[in-house]
Amino acid sequence: RSVVDKQVVNVVSRGFGVIALRDEVDTAVFLVHQNDPVPVSVEERFYTVADDQDTIKVRVFEQGGAEESPRPEDNTILVEGEITDLPPGYPRGTEITMRMSMGGDGILTVTAHHVARLEPLKLVVETGQAMNAAEVAAERDAVNLLKRNL
């Protein structure tokens, strides 16, 4: 594409997700992917792994290398939290709704909701992985300058 066609879009520089148990193995599940435009908001459903599960551990990670990897050890845990003291009576496979969002400020917000709770677990972390408004404006100015000089 020529410079005339270029646009500056703020994107996520690394992927983010949660560690989930898949086929009895901890797996890094990406919800936000590298180069997704910001703001971004993604919702995915996960499920409890046992009847009467009383705790849900939420581990949020950042992509550790150039490529997405499902191996937890290839990624960097940013923040952890738990939904605790869940009452008995919920079967294996009870839905947990996970929402992950990031604005142009690079702040990642993750909520995890189990039906037994009125309020979701909320985790917030400053990632530094998005350009701020001043950086986006500077990039736009640079592209506009190139366009004018063609």
Regions found by a protein language model. Give the residues of each.
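Acidic low-complexity intrinsically disordered segments
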Residues: 1-150
